[in-house]
């Protein structure tokens, strides 16, 4: 199945404590159907010291389920669903369902 949300996409969180926040996808975990979004769903992690890094409590992004985020329409800047369309040259691209705007270039 083709990925509707990919790395570096702009998304908005639909549910949970960070509802309404927007951010950039920094990692996609396709086997778990999860994504990590920059600055969203921060959790505190107790980091053990290593020879190169100091220990302590650090905040990292935890993964969100892909159903809890929506792509931001490049034309209207509102949440939208994503579909696929084949262009004349044979390329398969993602399109915003709300405006019909092509997401991939």
UniProtKB/Swiss-Prot annotation:
GO terms for biological process: translation. Keywords: Ribonucleoprotein, Ribosomal protein, RNA-binding, rRNA-binding. GO terms for molecular function: rRNA binding; structural constituent of ribosome. The keyword rRNA-binding applies. Gene3D superfamilies: 2.30.30.30. GO terms for cellular component: ribonucleoprotein complex; ribosome. Belongs to the universal ribosomal protein uL24 family. One of two assembly initiator proteins, it binds directly to the 5'-end of the 23S rRNA, where it nucleates assembly of the 50S subunit. One of the proteins that surrounds the polypeptide exit tunnel on the outside of the subunit. Part of the 50S ribosomal subunit. This is Large ribosomal subunit protein uL24. It comes from Rhodospirillum centenum (strain ATCC 51521 / SW). The gene is rplX.
């Amino acid at each position: 199945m083709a990925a509707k949300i990919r790395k570096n996409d702009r998304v908005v969180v639909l549910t949970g404590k960070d509802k309404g926040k927007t951010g950039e996808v920094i990692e996609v975990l396709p086997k778990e159907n999860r994504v990590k979004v920059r600055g969203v769903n921060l959790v505190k992690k107790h980091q053990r010291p290593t020879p190169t890094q100091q220990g302590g409590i650090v905040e990292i992004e935890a993964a969100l389920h892909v159903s809890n985020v929506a792509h931001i329409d490049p034309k209207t800047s509102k949440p939208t669903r994503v579909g696929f369309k084949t262009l004349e040259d044979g390329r398969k691209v993602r399109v915003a369902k709300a405006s019909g705007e092509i997401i991939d270039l």
